[in-house]
């Protein structure tokens, strides 16, 4: 197995500040709801020896990478190969968590090493399932079977892609001739109809985002998990959520607003964003927003 870790922990300094604000620093439970390769976990466990980690990761391939990467801390870690919403529905721990971290970004390993078609930069099968055994439909299934109307709605609703209508029409026309099987095929279909003069990012970016969100049921999992995260948070515990696009950030923002200020306190009025230096070192961090609250 290649042990190179692709992922850089986003907003790590801000997360460490949250941990340092915990009133008690002894035998605390830290749940990483989206363990990935373990980049956040490694940095946190190295710095704070009073934390024990519960690491949740649905993708068995990346979970094995995390176990190797975090081997030095194996005595302080319990792993769960599960979706985070399933874990919290059936919360298996005897005590509530003192710190819950949720990084909703897709690991760079999925883009660069998984061969599952998350990125249009490589020519790969158009799959995008984090776990093939629990996700019944692939991205290829969606683009080859959904109606033009359903494709247009999916692409717009899950990415705010303004050219969703022409993209969905192009997909439907192309598949009359040939089934779309790979990332490069789909990218070529999108590029052919996208006005490049209007493109601030790669024309395929938002469509790929929408497909990934749909395949893995990301927004529904987030909505299901929000009340479960705070339910399983100990008194004075902190929930920290990192989002990477406006749709999921709005869901988190609205949920935090709905909570009683007598029971929960937002750590900051506005989301915490990466510094210029962090963005310079780690370009994917540029869209990250951290929202956090404390259970009173």
UniProtKB/Swiss-Prot annotation:
InterPro entries tied to this protein: RsmH, SAM-dep_MeTrfase_MraW_recog, SAM-dependent_MTases_sf
EC number annotated for this UniProt entry: 2.1.1.199
Cellular-component GO terms for this entry: cytoplasm
Subcellular location: Cytoplasm
Reactions catalysed according to its record: cytidine(1402) in 16S rRNA + S-adenosyl-L-methionine = N(4)-methylcytidine(1402) in 16S rRNA + S-adenosyl-L-homocysteine + H(+)
Primary localization class, coarse: cytoplasm
Keywords: Cytoplasm, Methyltransferase, rRNA processing, S-adenosyl-L-methionine, Transferase
Positions of S-adenosyl-L-methionine binding: 38-40, 57, 80, 103, 110
GO BP of this protein: rRNA base methylation
Record keyword Endoplasmic reticulum present: no
Domain of life per record: Bacteria
One GO molecular-function entry: rRNA (cytosine-N4-)-methyltransferase activity
Pfam families: Methyltransf_5
The keyword S-adenosyl-L-methionine is annotated on this UniProt entry: yes
Gene3D superfamilies reported for this sequence: Putative methyltransferase TM0872, insert domain, Vaccinia Virus protein VP39
Family to which the UniProt record says this protein belongs: Belongs to the methyltransferase superfamily. RsmH family.
Biological role: Specifically methylates the N4 position of cytidine in position 1402 (C1402) of 16S rRNA.
UniProt xrefs under HAMAP family: 16SrRNA_methyltr_H
NCBIfam families to which the protein is assigned, alphabetical: 16S rRNA (cytosine(1402)-N(4))-methyltransferase RsmH
Protein name: Ribosomal RNA small subunit methyltransferase H
Organism listed in the record: Borrelia garinii subsp. bavariensis (strain ATCC BAA-2496 / DSM 23469 / PBi)
């Amino acid at each position: 197995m290649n042990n190179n870790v692709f992922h850089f922990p986003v907003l790590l300094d801000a997360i460490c500040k949250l941990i340092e604000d915990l009133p008690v620093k002894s035998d605390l439970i830290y749940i990483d709801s989206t363990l990935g390769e373990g980049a956040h976990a490694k940095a946190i466990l190295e710095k704070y020896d009073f934390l024990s980690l519960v690491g949740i990761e649905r993708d068995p391939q990346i979970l094995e990478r995390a176990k190797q990467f975090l081997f030095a801390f194996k005595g302080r870690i319990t792993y769960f190969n599960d979706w985070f919403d399933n874990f919290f529905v059936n919360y298996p721990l005897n005590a509530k968590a003192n710190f819950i971290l949720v990084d909703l970004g897709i690991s760079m390993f999925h883009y660069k090493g998984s061969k599952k078609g998350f990125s249009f930069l490589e020519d790969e099968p158009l799959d995008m399932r984090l776990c093939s055994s629990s996700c019944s439909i692939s991205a290829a299934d969606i683009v080859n079977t959904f109606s033009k109307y359903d494709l247009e709605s999916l692409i717009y609703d899950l990415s705010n892609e303004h050219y969703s209508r022409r993209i969905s029409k192009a997909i439907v026309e192309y598949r009359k001739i040939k089934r779309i099987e790979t990332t490069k095929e789909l990218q070529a279909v999108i590029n052919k109809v996208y006005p490049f003069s209007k493109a601030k990012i790669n024309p395929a970016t938002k469509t790929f985002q929408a497909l990934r969100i749909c395949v893995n049921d990301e927004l529904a999992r987030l909505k299901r998990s929000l009340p479960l995260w705070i339910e399983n948070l100990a008194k004075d515990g902190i929930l920290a959520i990192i989002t990477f696009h406006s749709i999921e950030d709005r869901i988190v923002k609205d949920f935090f607003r709905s909570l009683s200020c007598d029971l929960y306190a937002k750590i900051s009025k506005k989301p915490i964003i990466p510094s210029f230096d962090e963005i310079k070192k780690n370009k994917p961090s540029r869209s990250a927003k951290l929202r956090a609250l404390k259970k009173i």
